[in-house]
């Protein structure tokens, strides 16, 4: 594995994981907010 200025895999994994968690969190927050306002 050569270090040719490539981004470390763990950084990519952390960023991707945080992005997924953020999207899921926003989705659930929107769902709960929508249900709360509807009810």
UniProtKB/Swiss-Prot annotation:
A Pfam family assignment: PsbJ
Alphabetical list of SUPFAM superfamilies matching this protein: Photosystem II reaction center protein J, PsbJ
Family in the record: Belongs to the PsbJ family.
Name this polypeptide is given: Photosystem II reaction center protein J
Record GO biological process: photosynthesis
Organism in which the protein naturally occurs: Picosynechococcus sp. (strain ATCC 27264 / PCC 7002 / PR-6)
Entry keyword annotation includes Membrane: yes
Quaternary structure and interacting proteins, as annotated: PSII is composed of 1 copy each of membrane proteins PsbA, PsbB, PsbC, PsbD, PsbE, PsbF, PsbH, PsbI, PsbJ, PsbK, PsbL, PsbM, PsbT, PsbX, PsbY, PsbZ, Psb30/Ycf12, peripheral proteins PsbO, CyanoQ (PsbQ), PsbU, PsbV and a large number of cofactors. It forms dimeric complexes.
Biological role stated in the UniProt entry: This protein is a component of the reaction center of photosystem II. One of the components of the core complex of photosystem II (PSII). PSII is a light-driven water:plastoquinone oxidoreductase that uses light energy to abstract electrons from H(2)O, generating O(2) and a proton gradient subsequently used for ATP formation. It consists of a core antenna complex that captures photons, and an electron transfer chain that converts photonic excitation into a charge separation.
Alphabetical UniProt keywords: Membrane, Photosynthesis, Photosystem II, Reaction center, Thylakoid, Transmembrane, Transmembrane helix
Membrane-crossing segments per the record: 7-27
Membrane topology: Single-pass membrane protein
Domain of life: Bacteria
GO terms for cellular component: photosystem II reaction center; plasma membrane-derived thylakoid membrane
InterPro entries according to UniProt: PSII_PsbJ, PSII_PsbJ_sf
Location in or out of the cell: Cellular thylakoid membrane
This protein's record includes keyword ATP-binding: no
């Amino acid at each position: 594995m050569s270090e040719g200025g490539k981004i470390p895999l763990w950084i990519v994994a952390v960023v991707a994981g945080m992005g997924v968690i953020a999207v899921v969190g926003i989705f659930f927050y929107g769902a709960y907010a929508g249900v709360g306002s509807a009810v």
